[in-house]
Amino acid sequence: MFDLIVGVSNDAVNFLQSSVGAKAASFKTVLFIAGIGVFIGAALSNGMMDIARHGIYQPQHFYFAEIMCILLAVMLTDVVLLDVFNTMGMPTSTTVSMVFELLGGTFALALIKVNNSDTLGLGDLINTDKALSVIMAIFVSVAIAFFFGMLVQWLARVIFTFNYKKRMKYSIGIFGGIAVTSIIYFMLIKGLKDSSFMTADNKQWIQDNTAMLIGSCFIFFTILMQVLHWLKVNVFKVVVLLGTFALALAFAGNDLVNFIGVPLAGYSSFIDFTTNGAGSSPDGFLMTSLLGPAKTPWYFLFGAGVIMVYALCTSKKAHNVIKTSVDLARQDEGEENFGSTPIARTLVRFSMTLSNGISKVMPEGTKRWLDTRFRKDEAIIADGAAFDLVRASVNLVLAGLLIALGTSLKLPLSTTYVTFMVAMGTSLADRAWGRDSAVFRITGVLSVIGGWFITAGAAFTICFFVAMVIHFGGTFAIIALIGLAIFTLIRSQVMYKKRKAKEKGNETLKQLMQSNNNTEILDLLRKHTREELVKVLEFTEENFERTVTAFLHENLRGLRRAMGSVKFEKQLIKQMKRTGTLAMCRLDNNTVLEKGLYYYQGNDFASELVYSIGRLCEPCLEHIDNNFKPLDTIQKGEFSDVTEDIVYLLQVCRHKMENNDYEDFENELRKANDLNGQLSHLKREELQRIQTQSGSIKVSMVYLTMIQEAQNVVTYTINLMKVSRKFQLTE
C-alpha cells in the first residue's frame, strides 16, 4: 500500500503535467479524468508480473527464505527511496528503482550462494539484460523525446502561432484528427496491450489491420473535431484531456508491476511454500514456481486501482513533483527553482553561438516571417497557466505516439523519460528558455536526468546492503529495518510540512504574478517584500549571534554551520532580487518611479546584511581553524555586551517590519547611534592596545574586523528599516 502511494505520487507527473500546466480544466476535473484512467487501467490489467517473478533473478536456484529476503529488501528500499524523490519534488522512474533494487538484492544473495557453492556462478543466478536495457532506455528516451518534442512543437507553433485561435479555421480539424488518432493508437498498442480482454487473436487482428484502423480513425476524428470546432468546442482542451486519460490508463496498466509486482511475487511464493512445502524448511524449498506467469486475482487489481486513485487525489507530494516539471516548462520567466552550473552555462553559450551562426545564413525575409509566428506577447494562456493548450496537446500526443512506436519497434523507451523530455523539448521550441532563464532551466533538466542515474545507483546499493542485513540479522534485523523505514517516512513527512510552511510566502508571489490590477499588485508586492526582508533580518539575527558565540567559545562546528548558512542565504538573496524585479515590471510607470528606488535600496541593504555576516564569519572561522590564540577576557566581555544589544535591536526591527508598524522608530534610531558609538569606542580601545603591543596582532586583526562588521550590521539594519518604511507607506 505504501509503495502504491509513493509510486503514484511520483509517476503522476507523467500524465498530469500537461493538463495542469495549461489549466485545460479545473484541477479537480483533471484529477477526476486521470483517476478514471488509472482505475480502468489497473482493473483491466491482466496483472502479468513477470519482471518481479523471474525478470532479474533465476528463481529455480533460490530457496523460499532467500526469495523473501530479496523481496522484503526491495520493498523497504523502494518505499523510502521514492519518498525521498517525492519530498525533493524530483520526477524519477519507478521502473528503474524496482529493477535496480531487485538487481541489488539478488546480487547480495547471489554472492553468498556462489561463495557457498562450487556449481553456481553469478550468470546462473542473475539476469543482467533487463538492467542494461533500462540504462539504455535513459539515453535513447532522452535523445529521441527531446529532439522530436522540439521539432514537432516548432512546426505546430509555425502553423498555429501563439495567437492560435485566429489560425485554426480548418487546420484544427486535421490537427485534432491526427492527435486523437495518435492517442487511440497509443491506447491500443501500449495502454491496453496487456488487458484481460486483449487476447492473442485480438492483438494479431490489430497488427494485421493497423493501417485500416489508423486511416478510419483519422477520417472520422478529423470530421468530428472540425464539427466540434464549429460548435464552439475548444478542440485543444478535448485533445489534452483525452491524452491525459490515455496516459493515465497506460500508466496504471503497464507500471502496476512496479508497485504490486514485488509483494505479489512474495505472496505467490508464500502460497507455493505453504501448499507444496510440507516437510521442507524455508532454506530448502526451491522457488521454481516463479518461472511461470501468474494471473493476479481481480480483487488485487481492483484494490490497487482504488489506492492509486486515492493517492492521486490526496498526495501533496505528487503536486510537488508536478510543480517541478511545470516550472521547468513555464513560458514566462518567474521564480526559478534551480541555480546555475558550469555545464549549463557552457551549453547556453554553445547554443547561442550555434543560433547566431544559423541566423547569419538565414535570409532576412525568412527570419522576419518566423518572428511573426513566435510573438509571445500574443500568447493565449489561461490565468495561472504555465503554457498554452497547443503545447499541452503536442506534449501528450507526441509522448503517447513515441511510447507506442517504441513498444512496436521493441525500443526500450521509458514513459517517465519520454513525457518529461518531450515537455522540455517543446518548451525550448516555444522559446520559453530565454537568455535570463535558460541556464536555470538547463540546470533543472540536468538535475532531473542526473537523478535518474542516481536512482539506479542508490536503489542497487541500498537494497544490496539491506538484503545483506536481513540475511545475516534474521528476524531482529527485519523488525529494526521496518522500524527504521517507518521512522524515515514519518520524519520525511514532518520535514516536508515544515518546508512547505516556510515556502508559504511564495503564495503571495504567485498571487502577485497572476494579478492584473495595479493597486492589488502594489499591495501584494509590499506584503511579499515584508515577508522576504523579515526572513533576512531573522537570518542576520540568528547567524550574528551564532558566529560571535561560536568564536568566543572556539566552536569550529558552529562557525562552519554559520558559513554554510551564509552561502545558502546569498543564493536566496539573488533569487529574491530576480523575482522582485520581475514583480516590479508589473507595476505602472508612475508607481515604479515613486516606489521603485526604495524597493531596490531595500534589496541592496538586505544583501549587504548577508555579506556582512559572511565577512564577520570568514576571519573568525579561519582564526579558530588555525588554532590561533582566543580573545582575552576583556575583549570577550566588551563584545559580549554589545552583541546582546545588537541582537535585541535586530529582534525589535524584525517585529516592527513583520507587523508593518513603524511607530516610535526614532527609539531604534537612537539605540543604533548609541551602539555605533560604543563600537567606535571599542575600536579606539583596541587600536590603543595595538600601539602599546599588549596583545596578539592576529587577535587584534580579527577583533577589529568583528567590530567593523558589527557596525555594518547596525547601520544596514537601520537603513533597511528606513527605506522599508518609505516603500510600505501608503499615501
What do the PLM-derived regions correspond to, one by one?
Residues 1-519, 680:
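Multi-pass alpha-helical transmembrane bundle typical of ion/small-solute transporters
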Residues 494-731:
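Cytosolic, long alpha-helical scaffolding segments
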